[in-house]
Amino acid sequence: MATLPQHPPARQRIDLRPDRTERLLAGLAIVLLGFVLAALARGAADWGKLPGVLWLHLATMIATLGLTPAILWMPRGNRLHRGLGYAWVAALGLTAIDSFAIRTSSGALSAIHILSLVTLCALPALVITARRHDHVRHRRIVRGLVIGALLTAGFFTFPFDRMLGHWLFS
C-alpha cells in the first residue's frame, strides 16, 4: 500500500479585494465623518469653550474616519496600505486613550468607555495579525473595530444631550 507524502496543506488564497461589507463600512464612515464635520461647522461659535482634550479627541477621530474608507477600498498588502494602517491604529489608539479624560458632567466614566477599553485591547491583535499575514483574523478585527469603535461610538456622540448632537440638531 502506498503512502501519501506528508506535505503541509496548501494555504488557501484569500481574496484581499474589498467585499460588500467593507464597502458598506467605508461608506458609513464617510457618512459619519460628514455628520461630525457638519456639527463642527454649526458649533463654530462655541469652539473657544472647548478644552484641548476634546480637540485632540475630535482631531484623532476625524483622522481615523478619514483614513477608514481609503484603507478599506485600496489594494492591500503594499507599503501604502501598511503605512496608512499604522496611522489608523495610532489615531484610533490615541482616540481611545484620550476618551478616558472625557467624563460625564458628574465626572464619571460612561458606558461608552467600555468600547475604548476593548479598542485598546484589540489594536495590538490587529497589528499582530497583519504582521503574521493572518488575513482572516485581521479582517475580522478591522470590521469589529470599525463597527464598534467608530460607528457605534460615533452614533452615540449625537444624542441631543451630547456636544456634537446639540450642535448638529439645534
Which sequence ranges carry the predicted segments?
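Alpha-helical membrane insertion/targeting regions
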Residues: A2-S170
